[in-house]
Design a protein with these regions (language model features):
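FIC/Doc superfamily catalytic core
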Residues: 1-348
Length: 348
């Protein structure tokens, strides 16, 4: 069976990319702490928006979808689930809320992970909720011609409970003893979790919820204000590529987890940069036009209305579209393409 020794990671020599990402994340975290002290009320506006985006994106990655209106109503608990997808979305909302409110009293143990998994399915009858997998699972790819290829075989069901215990013990030990930088330990833990693939269903969503939990417990709160899940969903091909690279040789213990570490740290840093941009937009009461104007000035090269929506999540899509039209009419932006392929370029 695969063994785990997180202390050995200390011996690894990290390249300048990894070290640079870690330094930049700490710098952004310092700025975020300052904003939180100075403008807590304004930042609260970002929390609910991030919850909605996180719930929508993390489920969409797994093909679990409903309309944007229904997502908002479900996250705000103004409606009840109508179908299986909405039941799963409501479960994700519940677990995310638990993590937001109680992260400091949720230990990283198998029992608590199983409880969170059970809560993920609390709106439906799933006899496997809160239990490790009962059958062997596989990570596969389906190609355009219809053939399916196995990319990775996770641990067998009988090996799973012990492995889940071991990664929790190793993580808690190196964090508790301050042996390992949390921004290294967190991606390593999440990568091992995904390679174990402990559940029959819900592994991807649980991995993203655990990422948020581990970051909060280590003092990195950017995911509360900027959706990490939305960042992953936007670049999910890069996410799967990094994961596939890092899984090679995992069973033998000679994997190279650096691609996954870089991917996750890059995502956290990108969220930190977005936090700065978004704070600048909520600091003062601006018109929709001025918000979109300022957001467009944060973009380099071509961008679309979805890019602006990420920076101005408090605006409706119709407000963003109307503002973009006015900026084009004012010769501040140039529009290219049509329909879904419409993009914009700054002229000023």
């Amino acid at each position: 069976m695969r063994t785990f020794n997180y202390s050995a990671i200390r011996e690894q020599k990290w390249d300048s990319d990894v070290l640079g990402l870690i330094a930049a994340i700490y710098k952004e975290a310092g700025k975020q702490e300052l904003y939180l002290k100075q403008r807590p009320e304004e930042l609260e506006k970002l929390v609910e928006i991030a919850k909605i985006q996180s719930t929508e994106a993390s489920n969409a990655i797994e093909g679990i979808v409903t309309t944007s209106t229904r997502i908002r109503q479900l996250v705000e608990e103004k409606t009840t689930p109508r179908n299986r997808d909405e039941q799963e979305i409501a479960g994700y909302r519940d677990v995310l809320s638990i993590i937001h409110e109680s992260f400091d009293v949720i230990p990283i143990t198998q029992n608590y992970i199983l409880q969170l998994h059970k809560n993920l399915y609390s709106h439906m009858n799933n006899p496997l909720a809160g239990r490790t997998k009962s059958v062997q699972n596989y990570i596969t790819a389906t190609y355009p011609d219809g053939h399916v290829e196995t990319l990775f075989t996770p641990l067998a069901p009988y090996e799973t409970p012990e492995a889940l215990d071991r990664i929790c013990e190793e993580y808690n030990r190196v964090i508790g003893n301050m042996e390992l930088e949390p921004l290294i330990a967190i991606p390593v833990f999440i990568h091992d979790f995904l390679c174990i693939h402990p559940f029959n269903d819900g592994n991807g969503r649980m991995s993203r919820l655990l990422t948020t939990l581990l970051l909060y417990r280590s003092g990195f709160y950017v995911g509360k204000y900027i959706s990490l899940e939305a960042k992953i969903a936007k670049n999910k091909d890069l996410y799967y590529d990094a994961l596939a690279q890092a899984q090679t040789g995992w069973h033998e213990g000679n994997e190279d987890v650096v691609p996954f570490i870089k991917y996750l740290l890059g995502t956290i840093l990108a969220a930190g940069k977005d936090f700065e941009d978004r704070v600048a937009l909520v600091e003062t009461k601006l018109s929709a036009l001025e918000m979109v104007r300022r957001a467009s000035k944060n973009r380099i090269g071509r961008f679309n209305k979805q890019d602006i929506r990420e920076l101005c999540p408090s605006l409706s899509l119709s407000s963003i579209e109307g503002s973009l039209r006015k900026l084009v009419e004012n010769d501040e932006l140039k529009r290219e393409g049509a329909g879904k392929s419409t993009v914009y370029l700054r002229l000023k």
